[in-house]
Regions:
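Sec-dependent N-terminal signal peptides
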Residues: 3-13
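N-terminal "domain-start" segment that seeds a small globular fold
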Residues: 15-38
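Alpha/beta-hydrolase fold active-site loops
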Residues: 45-46, 124
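Hydrophobic beta-strand anchors of alpha/beta hydrolase catalytic cores
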Residues: 47-48, 78
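Conserved redox-active cysteine motifs that mediate thiol-disulfide chemistry
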Residues: 50-67
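Thiol-based oxidoreductase modules, predominantly thioredoxin-like and allied folds used
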Residues: 75-88, 102-110
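Short, internal strand/loop/helix patches
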Residues: 92-125, 129-131
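Thiol-/selenol-based redox modules, centered on thioredoxin-like
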Residues: 128-169
Length: 169
């Protein structure tokens, strides 16, 4: 019986992981008025975070992302993306209030939908993209992803990509 349950769980895990897919492209304006095109980051590891400025989990996660940017420097690009009802004013307040060291971009929903592929989005949601532009992993903040959103698990995942770990199947 244990073997059957273990086999089923492994099958569910493999199905949930799914195949690698190319990260959908986007070109969005940041809070300083600069256009940020995902294609410009090819060759780097990229974290794409979908967030909201009034989300307390997103606010606390910004500290983790700032720390990762310091730790990895130019080897890691971080792009945070907010959707309405956020606007340039609320976003600028968030950038200044949390001393963001990475760009915060405004999306009208197109980029978010192309990543998540569902009409609703839990926040924060994070995508890890490899240097070839492939989504290697994604996470939604929650009990099961606590290690990722506290930074330790995320650092391990980034280190694997920097070391040239093979893509998950």
């Amino acid at each position: 019986m244990k073997t059957i349950v273990a086999t089923l769980l492994c099958g569910v895990a493999l199905f949930a992981a799914g195949p690698l897919r190319r990260a959908p492209g986007f070109c969005l304006m940041d809070t300083s008025g600069q256009w940020q095109d995902l294609a410009d980051y090819r060759g780097k590891i990229v974290l794409v975070e979908f967030m909201k400025t009034e989300c307390p989990h997103c606010a606390s996660f910004s500290t983790v992302l700032n720390g990762l940017k310091v730790k990895y420097g130019d080897k890691l690009a971080i792009l945070a993306i907010a959707n309405p009802p956020d606007n340039p004013q609320t976003m600028l307040q968030f950038v200044k209030g949390h001393n963001l060291t990475y760009p915060l971009l405004l999306d009208q929903g197109q980029a978010a939908y192309s990543y998540v592929r569902t009409p609703s989005l839990e926040l924060p949601t994070l995508y890890l993209i490899d240097a070839n532009g492939m989504i290697r992993n994604s996470w939604v903040d929650g009990v099961l992803t606590k290690d990722i959103f506290e930074g330790n698990g995320l650092s391990r995942e980034i280190d694997k990509l920097l070391a040239g770990a093979p893509a998950k199947k």
